[in-house]
Amino acid sequence: MRPPWYPLHTPSLAFPLLFLLLSLLGGGARAEGREDPQLLVRVRGGQLRGIRLKAPGGPVSAFLGIPFAEPPVGSRRFMPPEPKRPWSGVLDATTFQNVCYQYVDTLYPGFEGTEMWNPNRELSEDCLYLNVWTPYPRPASPTPVLIWIYGGGFYSGAASLDVYDGRFLAQVEGAVLVSMNYRVGTFGFLALPGSREAPGNVGLLDQRLALQWVQENIAAFGGDPMSVTLFGESAGAASVGMHILSLPSRSLFHRAVLQSGTPNGPWATVSAGEARRRATLLARLVGCPPGGAGGNDTELIACLRTRPAQDLVDHEWHVLPQESIFRFSFVPVVDGDFLSDTPEALINTGDFQDLQVLVGVVKDEGSYFLVYGVPGFSKDNESLISRAQFLAGVRIGVPQASDLAAEAVVLHYTDWLHPEDPTHLRDAMSAVVGDHNVVCPVAQLAGRLAAQGARVYAYIFEHRASTLTWPLWMGVPHGYEIEFIFGLPLDPSLNYTTEERIFAQRLMKYWTNFARTGDPNDPRDSKSPQWPPYTTAAQQYVSLNLKPLEVRRGLRAQTCAFWNRFLPKLLSATDTLDEAERQWKAEFHRWSSYMVHWKNQFDHYSKQERCSDL
């Protein structure tokens, strides 16, 4: 899904001579940049030269591949980022730069549904670059800024993906849009908590450094540093939530949009102990420290820094504690620093009085993940599963569940009039994964933030794109609202329908209205249906589809009461039972061993001569 836009050129008979002259003067692109002051910007690090791009309705300015940190290579691997040192001359910012080193999805080679999320630039650990799109010419007055944080399970993703093209929002809505790369997987989230060599959460620190860069430099592009909105999807949305919960980040933005992800999701963080276990297991898998000896943190990290990046990526998935889906190997850690406590605790105790938040989900959050390991599922058939496959899928989809908790999930999601129906079982499995990992954490976050003083708006996205290549049974999968938010249907070459183009314009307006005012509604349009705030009492949210806005109440309220209220209590109770059972078994084992020992001693005693005389 790559929009076929190219830099604007003005045809001229004199162009070949002009090009030759400019080449002799030091390069056509550089000279063209000097001729157009709109494409030259000075930031704190030095001067940049951008590029003018076509977009529907007119051109935009793009400044691509701007370095905001020193390359995190060599001894900087696993370390917090360092700000980019100043450069001399004019830095070329006309093309995207490297993608951070990561796992590449090869499950369905050549299939657009997976390839659109795979890296589209060279993989490298030298990857900390950001991009800025602005209206052309530059805004005369400070313009609200939108900062995009991509998703990808904290193990993949890139700001340069075609689906994140910022030109449409910049041109149609007059927004200043920023996106950044951040380290993922082992390189961004391997943690030995308490260690200076690999403290963890450096991918989040990459994001924070980019936010600081925006505060220092965005005014030069026409952006308003006093009106910054973060928005992200999936792990990007979880990242946005973690910046909300991390005090040093809170002064760097003013509003937040969380699309299909939260910091309180069961996949979004791990404890310090689990992070250390995964890091040391990865080290052992790649032969660190050499010889298999114990070694301290410094020796372990020094060894890991010598290993090729691909070796680390190849072993990432082997550190997960059990077979699962929607679980990722290296993710943010509750480190006592970036995250001073668990996200749940911080959400419950935080003060969000001055915060405006937009949160939401898509209709079928779980379906995308089922083809990555749940028995019976594939993109190439209807995935009509048996009850046995459903039961096995629940254990993979809710990996932390005890036997009793898994049985409760099965009980809740089974259609007891048709308990063996393959279609229902398939759809129920999708709902289990989506509700558990996305929908109910979003509902919980919306309620808690609203209760703590934030102004919250909520949505469910229900439109399946006419161009979608995933099978019909997957519905509206995770991630497939993004193309509408970024305005890709406005590109006629991508073959969206007219209705989808109008729908995309509507969504772009909602998102940019929210970025400007903290309210997605247009204050100049009193005739259109209004999007009400989400409150703990009314729990109002809207459906986003080709129809007019519809207000609903209670986002999967009954089901989310199961996940957010009942199941945690059940898990807590069964944890106690499991511990009691473990202790009982240990005591029984000790007692049994004692009895065997006693019987052996008794038998030995009985065989002695004095006993035989009795």
From Swiss-Prot:
Catalytic activity: acetylcholine + H2O = choline + acetate + H(+)
Function: Terminates signal transduction at the neuromuscular junction by rapid hydrolysis of the acetylcholine released into the synaptic cleft.
GO annotation (BP), single: osteoblast development
Record has Cell membrane as a keyword: yes
One GO cellular component term: neuromuscular junction
Self-association state and partner proteins as the record states: Isoform H generates GPI-anchored dimers; disulfide linked. Isoform T generates multiple structures, ranging from monomers and dimers to collagen-tailed and hydrophobic-tailed forms, in which catalytic tetramers are associated with anchoring proteins that attach them to the basal lamina or to cell membranes. In the collagen-tailed forms, isoform T subunits are associated with a specific collagen, COLQ, which triggers the formation of isoform T tetramers, from monomers and dimers. Interacts with PRIMA1.
Tissue specificity comment: Predominates in most expressing tissues except erythrocytes where a glycophospholipid-attached form of ACHE predominates.
Family: Belongs to the type-B carboxylesterase/lipase family.
Signal peptide, first to last residue: 1-31
Disulphide connectivity of cysteines: 100-127, 288-303, 440-560
InterPro entries: AB_hydrolase_fold, AChE-related_enzymes, AChE_tetra, CarbesteraseB, Carboxylesterase_B_AS, Carboxylesterase_B_CS, Cholinesterase
MF terms in GO: acetylcholine binding; acetylcholinesterase activity; collagen binding; identical protein binding; laminin binding; protein homodimerization activity; serine hydrolase activity
Leftover remarks: Synapses usually contain asymmetric molecules of cholinesterase, with a collagen-like part disulfide-bonded to the catalytic part. A different, globular type of cholinesterase occurs on the outer surfaces of cell membranes, including those of erythrocytes. This is the catalytic subunit of an asymmetric or soluble form of ACHE.
Tagged with keyword Cell membrane: yes
EC number of the protein: 3.1.1.7
Class of this enzyme: hydrolase
Membrane topology: Peripheral membrane protein
Transmembrane segments: none
The species this protein was found in: Mus musculus
Glycosylated sites: 296, 381, 495
Protein keywords: Cell membrane, Disulfide bond, Glycoprotein, GPI-anchor, Hydrolase, Lipoprotein, Membrane, Neurotransmitter degradation, Secreted, Serine esterase, Signal, Synapse
Official protein name in the record: Acetylcholinesterase
CDD domains, A to Z: Esterase_lipase
